[in-house]
Amino acid sequence: MPKHEFSVDMTCEGCSNAVTRVLNKLGGVQFDIDLPNKKVCINSEHSVDTLLETLGKTGKAVSYLGPK
């Protein structure tokens, strides 16, 4: 399963909870949230575009850092 790393502008636990909510709703993903470094690593067969769109639903600034 491909692993991707994203930068997400998270500042608190509420932000990381929002990321957890949207990714769990998408399904088919395993992920780790690194709140201090504002990064999310996702293992998923979903496309990068789908993952970006899903993370964008949190209302936070999101960018794709590349494969991990």
Swiss-Prot record:
Positions of the HMA domain: 1-63
Keywords on record: Acetylation, Chaperone, Copper, Copper transport, Ion transport, Metal-binding, Phosphoprotein, Transport
InterPro entries in alphabetical order: Copper_transport_ATOX1-like, Heavy-metal-associated_CS, HMA_dom, HMA_dom_sf
Key word Isomerase present: no
GO MF terms, alphabetically ordered: copper chaperone activity; metal ion binding
Spans traversing the lipid bilayer: none
Residues with the N6-acetyllysine modification: 60
Superkingdom, natural source: Eukaryota
Keyword Translocase carried by entry: no
GO cellular component: a single term: cytosol
Pfam families: HMA (PF00403)
Phosphoserine: residues bearing it: 47
GO BP term, pick one: copper ion transport
Subunit structure: Homodimer. Interacts with ATP7B. Interacts with ATP7A. Interacts (via dimer form) with SLC31A1 (via C-terminal domain); this interaction improves ATOX1 stability and controls intracellular Cu(I) levels.
Record's function text: Binds and deliver cytosolic copper to the copper ATPase proteins. May be important in cellular antioxidant defense.
PANTHER family assigned: COPPER TRANSPORT PROTEIN ATOX1 (PTHR46365:SF1)
UniProt free text on domains: The heavy-metal-associated domain (HMA) coordinates a Cu(+) ion via the cysteine residues within the CXXC motif. The transfer of Cu(+) ion from ATOX1 to ATP7A involves the formation of a three-coordinate Cu(+)-bridged heterodimer where the metal is shared between the two metal binding sites of ATOX1 and ATP7A. The Cu(+) ion appears to switch between two coordination modes, forming two links with one protein and one with the other. Cisplatin, a chemotherapeutic drug, can bind the CXXC motif and hinder the release of Cu(+) ion.
Family the UniProt entry places it in: Belongs to the ATX1 family.
Protein name: Copper transport protein ATOX1
Annotated source species: Bos taurus (Bovine)
